């Protein structure tokens, strides 16, 4: 199931709960642009209502979703985070770019350090554009 756009008071999260006969739910969250406070409340409620016997996986988890996980302990429900989008910024050419990272032991073990990437436009090293410790520690805590 692909979730895109803004998660807010106009969002219909009912497809997350239309799981008759399913034992797995895979969410592609790369298209989530932002989430407001009403969206956070509704998202947490939707995650809570997914039966515990359904395996839930988040793929390509967008930056706004990862940021919410850093602040709200139960934001993910009983989901497993398989991959995240990581924000980077190039000081040389002013490019913002997100790289896909698979969640594995290297990413979720202290010290939390963002891998280095070169800018796809100018080839210079890019800077991770969030607080590494918070960003990666929140993901690490999911399956701990």
Residue ranges and their predicted role:
Residues 1-82:
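Amphipathic alpha-helical interaction surfaces in cytosolic regulatory modules
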Residues 67-144:
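Cys/His-clustered metal-coordination modules, chiefly Zn-binding fingers
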């Amino acid at each position: 199931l692909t979730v895109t756009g803004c998660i807010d008071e106009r969002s219909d999260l009912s497809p997350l709960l239309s799981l008759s006969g399913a034992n797995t739910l895979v969410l592609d969250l790369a298209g989530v642009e932002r989430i407001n406070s009403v969206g956070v409340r509704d998202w947490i409620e939707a995650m809570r209502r997914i039966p515990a016997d359904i395996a839930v996986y988040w793929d390509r988890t967008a930056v706004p979703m990862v940021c919410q996980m850093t602040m709200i302990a139960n934001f993910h429900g009983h989901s497993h985070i398989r991959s995240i989008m990581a924000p980077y910024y190039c000081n040389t050419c002013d490019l913002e770019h997100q790289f896909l990272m698979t969640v594995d032991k290297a990413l979720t073990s202290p010290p939390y350090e963002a891998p280095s990437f070169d800018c796809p436009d100018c080839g210079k090293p890019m800077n991770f554009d969030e607080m590494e410790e918070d960003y990666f520690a929140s993901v690490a805590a999911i399956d701990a």
